[in-house]
Structures are given as C-alpha cells and as structure tokens.
Amino acid sequence: MKTTRRSFLKLVGVSVVGLSLGQLGFDLEDAQAYAVKLKIEGAKEVGTVCPFCSVCCQVIAYVRNGKLVSTEGDPDFPVNEGALCAKGAALFSMYTNPHRLTKPLYRAPHSDKWVEKDWDWTLNQIARRVKDARDKDMILKNDKGQTVNRLESIFMMGTSHASNEECAVIHQAMRGLGVVHMDHQARVUHSPTVAALAESFGRGAMTNHWIDIKNTDAVLIIGSNAAEHHPVAFKWIMRARDNGAVLMHVDPKFSRTSARCDFHVPLRSGTDIAFLGGMVNHIIAKDLYFKDYVANYTNAAFVVGKDYAFEDGIFSGYDPKTRTYDRSKWEFEKGPDGGPVMDPTLKNERCVFNLMKKHYERYTLKNVSDVTGVSEENLLRVYDAFCATGRPDKAGTILYALGWTQHTVGVQNIRTSTLIQLLLGNIGVAGGGINALRGEPNVQGSTDHALLYHILPGYNAMPVAQWQTLADYNKANTPVTTLKNSANWWSNRPKYVASLLKGWFGDAATPENDFCYEYLPKLEKGEDYSYMYVMDRMYHGKLKGGFIFGVNPMNSFPNTNKMRAALDKLDWLVCSELHNSETTDNWKRPGVDPKACKTEVFLLPSAHRVEKAGTISNSGRWLQWFDKAVEPGQARNFADIFVPLVNKIRALYKAEGGTLPDPVLKLHWTDKFDPEEWTRRINGFFWADTKVGDKEYKRGQLVPAFGQLKDDGSTSSLNWLYTGSYTEEDGNKSKRRDARQTPMQANIGLFPNWSWCWPVNRRILYNRASVDVNGKPWNPKKAVIEWDGAKWVGDVPDGPWPPMADKEKGKLPFIMNKDGFAQFYGTGRMDGPFPEHYEPAETPLDSHPFSKQLSSPVYKFHTSDMDQIAKAADPKYPIVLTTYSLTEHWCGGGETRNVPNLLETEPQLYIEMSPELAEEKGIKNGDGVIVESIRGRAEAIAMVTVRIRPFTVMGKTVHLVGMPFAYGWTTPKCGDSTNRLTVGAYDPNTTIPESKACLVNVRKADKLTEIA
C-alpha cells in the first residue's frame, strides 16, 4: 500500500497520542474509542484550493451526507505541506457564516430595500438590459470610418476569484458582446509586474516558484511584508535561512517580516528606485557584476541610436503638451541588415552598458540616503550582502508585492530590480529570480486569460482600429529579428491568435473570413479603457450599466468618495458576491438617501470555492485542479451565470434581430457549463485530422503541445500557454499528485510531476541562462538544467536547442524577446528606457538631488471636481500615508470581515504612527484619530508604536503613518475605507493607482462616528 504524507501523519498522530497517554498511566481504551469519533470520521475527502492569496495552498474538504464538516491543509501538497494561514484556516467558517448570500436579490431604482427573485426572472431582466444597450450603443465604425464593432456603454469588472475556466467563459462572452471596458483586480495590484518583467525578460510572470526560494543565498524582501501577507510562502524563506541564506527586509515599517530577518532597513515610501538605483551604481562601480552572464545573455553591448538623450530628469522625445514621449527617439542603432549594432568590447560610449553606468552615477550613497531616509551605513549593509551573489556559485532572490507596484513609477520600480538581477546573473537560476508575491487567488490565471481590456488570452495584443484585418494585426504584432541565434518565439503569434479565434467562433471561423477577426471589438489607439478610466467615464455619466463580480471597488479603489459617487450614475448594475459589500450596497451607504439613487441592482449569490470545480494558477504558474465538495444551493459559480445569460441574449437576437448579431450568434458556445469541458477548450483541439510526427490525431482530439498549433484553422486553443495541460495520452494534468522526482530535480525541489505549469511544465523560467555557453550549470550544486551532449536534463528547458557554443543551432535564453537577450535598456515603456527616480504625485519634498524633474512627467491623472492632488511639500498635509493588508483579512476585507473569528482578531481600522508624531499631535495609544487628505477623511484608532520611525529626508524630518485598507461601512462600527484618502494618480504604463504614498494630516478626534 502506498503511504502518503497525509496517511503517515494520521498514523503518527494516533501512535504519538497513544504513547504519551500510556506513559502517563491513563487507560487508553476510552480515549481511543473517543478518538475515532472525530467529526471527520466517515467523511469523504475532497481536494480544493484556498481562495485567498496566490500561494494557492491545497486544502482537504471533509464532506459527510452532502455537508461540509471540516477543512484542513493538505499535507501532501509540496508547497503548503498541510500548513494554512489564519484566513485559510478559517475557510470552513467562511463557508458556514450567517452572512452568506443564498438567493438572487433585486433592488429597484430609488428603492430602499432588497427583494428576493428567482434566477430565471433575474437572468431574463439582465439579458434584456444588455441587449437593449448593445442594440442602441454599439459603435460599428469610428470617426475615421474604420470598423471597430465595440460597445462602450457596458463594462465588466472582475475577477481573480474566478477559475481559469470561468475566466475563459467571461472573456469569450465579453468580446462576443463587443465590450472593451473590461478589467479585474490585476490592474490595481500587479499590473506593473507583467509590464516590467516582460520588458526585461520577455514574460511577465514570477520567474521561479515558491519552493525554489529555499535554494537562495540571499533574500531581499522589499515592498512586501511577506510573513504577514504570505505566511505559508514565508516558510520557504525560513528554509532558506536554515540553509544559510541572509534575509533582508527593506520597508517603511518594522513588522513580523522584519523580526525574522537578519536586519530591517526602513525607507520612505515611494523612493525604491533611488534605493535600487544606488545598488546598480554600487555593482558597476565596485565591479561586482557577473561578466560572462552580462556579456552573453543581456543587451549590454547594443548601441543606442544618436537620438537618445537624457537631461535633468527628462528623456529625449518628450512633448510637454501631451505629457508623452516619442519612443522612436530611444531606438537602437541599426546595421546594414536592419539589426542592432553591437559592441562586445563595451567601449562604445553609447552602448547600453555605458549609458546605464552613466545614468546611475548620480545615485551616490549621499544622494540616495538624502532621498530615501536610509543611512549610508544601512545602504551599504544591504548592497554588500545582496551583491555578494553576483558569482556563479551564489544566487539571490528579490521578493516584492504591492509596496512596489502601487506607485506612479510601479513598473519602473520592478524594472530597476531586473537591472540588478541581470547584473548579478540571478535570472534563470535556482534560488534566484524576481518573485512577485501576488495576493489574489487566481490573479495569475485571470491575467493569463486576459480579464483585462488591453490583451487577448495568452498575452496577445487587443486589436486597435488601425488593424482592420488579421493580416494587419499579425504584421503589427509579430516581431522580426535578424539574429539567427534568437528563437524570437513571438514569431509564432499568428498561430496562437488564429487558434484562439477558432476556439471562440468554431466552424464559423475560416481562413476566408479572417477567422471572424472582424467581429472582435477594436480599441482606439492610445485610449485607456482600464478600471480608473471606467470609473471616470462612469462619474461623467457615459456608462449605462455593467457587471462587478468578485471585486469590491467601492472599498479598494483610490479616491473612494469619487468612485461611490460614480456608481450612483449607472442605470443598472449586476453584482455577484458571497456577501453584501460596499459595492453591492452602495445605494444605501452612510449619508446617502436611497431614494435619490436611480441605479437598478441585481445581486447574484456566488458559489464558494468548495462549491465548484476547475483550475487555478498559482503565482509560480502551477495549474491546480480543485473538485466540488458540496452543492451550492441557489448560489452559482460565475460561469453558471454567464453561460445561460449569453444563451438568453442569443435567444433574443434570434427572435428579434438587432445590431450586429453575428458575433453573439456565431460564438462557439455551450448549453451548460462543464468545467472540464472548458479545461479541454483552453488546451485546444484539432479541427481537422492531423499527423504530428508519427502519430495521427482525429478532428476533436486534444492538441498535445503549443508547437502543434497552426494558423490555418486546423487547431483551436483558448490560451496557447495552456496547450499541453490536457492531452489524449495523460488526461487532465492539473489533477496530477505525483511527488516523484529525479535526484537532480529533487535537489532543488522542482516537483515536475505534481500538477502542471505553463509553459510546457517548465518550473523555472529562462533556465537556459542558468548554464554557460557549453550548457554546463553555473552552479553544479544547484543545477536547474544541464546539456548531456545530446539533450537537456533537469527542468524542461526554455527551448530544445543546443547550447550557445553550437553556433549554427544554439539559441539565446530569453526566447520571448525579439533578439533573444535580456534587456537592461528597453524601448517599450512609456516613462523611459531606464528607470529614474521621481517623487510620488504627492510628496513632502519640493526638490530632490537627481534632477529638477520632481515627479514623473508622464503619470496619469483625472481632472474632475473630485480629483485633487496636493501640491508638493503642502504644509496642510505634511505626513506620508502608506496602506497595507493584514494577515487576518483579505484585501478590502469584504469576505473576511464576515467571518466572526477573523473580525475578532482584527476588529477595526487603526493608524500606526511613531511616538514622536504622536507626541507632536497630542495623541495617545488607543485614541480616536481623524486622518485627512485633500480628497477626504477617515476615522481610525491610534496605534503608537516604535515600528514606525520618522525619516530624515533632505535635511528635514518627514513623518510616515500606515493604515490597513481592510475595513468598510457594511461591517458596523469597524471603520470605513482608507482609500477615501488615497490619490487618483496612476502609472503611465498600466494605470495602477499610487495607493502606497500620499499626503495626509492627523489630529485627535473629538468624537468618532464610524468606529465603536
């Protein structure tokens, strides 16, 4: 009989209890009889996945007589090994809590109450609202006469709570309807991750995976409080420490993470580029970089064209009227063949390496210290410890979260870290990488499946009006390289897009009609359809209705007062949630008369994780299947809402006709949602009999790998990255629970037979950079892959080609970049080819030493009467506010505040401040406090603590305070949204808001009305 970790623990538990009690002289007969009467006795074990952060711990749900009786961590899962954080441990309580929505509810315009309705009536009403809006508002052609087929009056928000299969359903439905205003949580949490990592490496995902952290020699945690916000992931950090790694925490406040690290270095929020830029300067000036890695695998030798310049904080090509750059001024110098000119000697003053060196020479210890508030001694402490990994036998990893992303320079924060890791040779290696600590349960998968306005599934660009035909699209989005040793993998894009369209429109999609490409909605070039612009257009009355599923923007979006006012202007709204939230109940928020709110609201009860089946993708790209443990009652999963809703809309078009019905009627749709059917659709099918190698496949069989996808209509795939996850030979690979490894794989904890991960089950991205040009590992003691003379062994290599020493067949390791090299210098970002320090939109300074340009010259903002930004060094608001999550609450708290034991542990909104600031303001620990920004105010309880200290910045004292954002008015007397204070200023690349740095003032409250 096979013994699993779980069965072993059960046996050990019984034997240990028996041994202990027997030694104490107890009669064990009664105790043993009682032990078998545990509440899980006779219960069925069902595997599910925790619905909170992207560690995605696996959970055992115990079911007896169709009812959930208990949940616990799965000890067999290699990542969590049975462990759960406070939220995961409360999974059973969240399922059973009395606040769950159980039936569809309806709020009529101007009504002050909810009314119960049945599903059929509710979906019929929603279908009618959607069709009427689509018939009236569909834009067939733009002002230039170009076919665009888009619907702007309806929006879709959500959700990273959806499974991959639900995401596939939602995306296909929205594009069929013509919706362009589609976004989800990734926009406001980790959108800079994709934009930054893809610019440097080619892909936007976490480079390594959770278990791999144990292999590192140095951990730099910056912009994250990992111990509190990713507790299970943190155990792999502690494994690294047990193995001898040095742990560093750089963060504005001292926390549990700081306490477990070797040292903590506080820095002022919003100054990460200055801090990291100083490290870049330190590496180059001290000659600490990994020369072979830099020379062979990066674009350090590329020569930049003569139009490039940088002067006083501004790159060449800047237009102050439009606040944008002409990025053509940053292009590389071209040779006679049209390819990049390179100088392997690195002597050309315009080669990337020398331009980078010059750019960061200004980032001296003094300048960095003056801006960040970090002493020169502490700067060197971090720099020296981390830069010691810039050698073949060492590796360092950087871990970050929203402390980096939620800034007007969020993308460039992360980009700066890529410069460091490339200089040190820490990408592609075990224990290396830049690893995003994502906080949403399927934010990786929901981004892969593109619940975002600007991309199609698999990170393909969303069509714009200029690309009228599929040929136009392919020409604009398929890169061409002159370098024969570059794989240029995106040259395969036409195959992936044709297969996607075939999956969406089935037999209707043919080569003759461009695979129904015309049906896709087309964006206007340069227009932003993201969350923040949806809300601004809503505020100005330009939207009629929409869907908000599994997200609570009325609590978690910045400048919340504006957001709440905007929602009042909708004609209708459809929400799907586990509980009432600040969004679902916006019409009856404090200070508002429900009778004055016209919005018609349909509130649909959402199925809990244990009530549905499907897959999620954790932050390390592992595709994990979860089974349905119990029936959902009248609650429904998101796909079981959208599948019948689309069918009802289709029925209306068949009966009545209407505007542009074909994109809806010709969808390759289904009558009923079956999650495993959609898992197969995501993988993809052959639509014609095909021979692959010596194996023949029939129409309707599964495509075995994305290498077999075609651009001729003979294959389909709803996401090329996931092709190979479900095959005729091996079935559904996301269900695999096989912990077997080769000794080489086990040495670094790859677990290649547990679940499956994209792409092609590769566990460490860019792993061909972990070897030298002969295919030998830089660090043989922690080899990821190795060339044995005929093939690669270890992890699945980033391409099958031989090592670079083979001049004819060898390929560069960064295969998703056009020219195959990792990029120190990149031309694809809106705010510069190199990261540059700029102050936050709201800053306590009126100057800094790096340039005369105070804040980013291209950050985005709105100009309505409710969009205000405090002036630099505003004496009315002298204090920096940063926001953060809590261990016990998930993000905005909409779910966890409804779990009594979690609310009891963290019951109310508080503000952390230093003793010095408290003394200055006459505030004592436990006092009620009013916190005010130029946009709004919030109440909080003072937590006076030495965990936060004042900073000395540019010769003056700057105070910082911190507040969680997990509270809202629907939970009585706990406080309301912190985001009423935060600023509506956004990164120019991804429009993520700057929630981690704004200006406020604090005072002792005479009276509290929001907190008991």
Curated annotation (Swiss-Prot):
Family in the record: Belongs to the prokaryotic molybdopterin-containing oxidoreductase family.
Q: Which NCBIfam families match?
A: formate-DH-alph
Temperature notes read: Optimum temperature is 51 degrees Celsius.
**Residues of the signal peptide:** 1-33
Source organism: Nitratidesulfovibrio vulgaris (strain ATCC 29579 / DSM 644 / CCUG 34227 / NCIMB 8303 / VKM B-1760 / Hildenborough) (Desulfovibrio vulgaris)
Q: What is the recorded function of this protein according to its Swiss-Prot or TrEMBL entry? A: Alpha chain of the formate dehydrogenase (FDH) that catalyzes the reversible two-electron oxidation of formate to carbon dioxide. The alpha subunit of formate dehydrogenase forms the active site.
Q: What class of enzyme is it?
A: oxidoreductase
Q: Which InterPro entries match?
A: Asp_de-COase-like_dom_sf, Formate-DH-alph_fdnG, MoPterin_dinucl-bd_dom, Mopterin_OxRdtase, Mopterin_OxRdtase_4Fe-4S_dom, Mopterin_OxRdtase_prok_CS, MopterinOxRdtase_cofactor_BS, TAT_signal
Question: Has the keyword Chaperone been applied to this entry?
Answer: no
For this record, the Gene Ontology CC terms, alphabetical, are: formate dehydrogenase complex; periplasmic space
Q: What is the recorded name of this protein?
A: Formate dehydrogenase 2 subunit alpha (cytochrome c-553)
Query: What would be an example GO MF term here?
Result: 4 iron, 4 sulfur cluster binding
**Cystine residue pairs:** none
Description of post-translational modifications: Predicted to be exported by the Tat system. The position of the signal peptide cleavage has not been experimentally proven.
Name of the coding gene: fdnG-3
- Binding residues for W-bis(molybdopterin guanine dinucleotide): U189
Q: Which cofactor does it need?
A: [4Fe-4S] cluster; W-bis(molybdopterin guanine dinucleotide)
* Places the protein is found: Periplasm
Pfam families assigned: Molybdop_Fe4S4, Molybdopterin, Molydop_binding
Top-rank taxon of the source lineage equals Bacteria
- Which conditions up-regulate this protein? The trimeric FdhABC(3) complex is the main formate dehydrogenase enzyme in the presence of molybdenum.
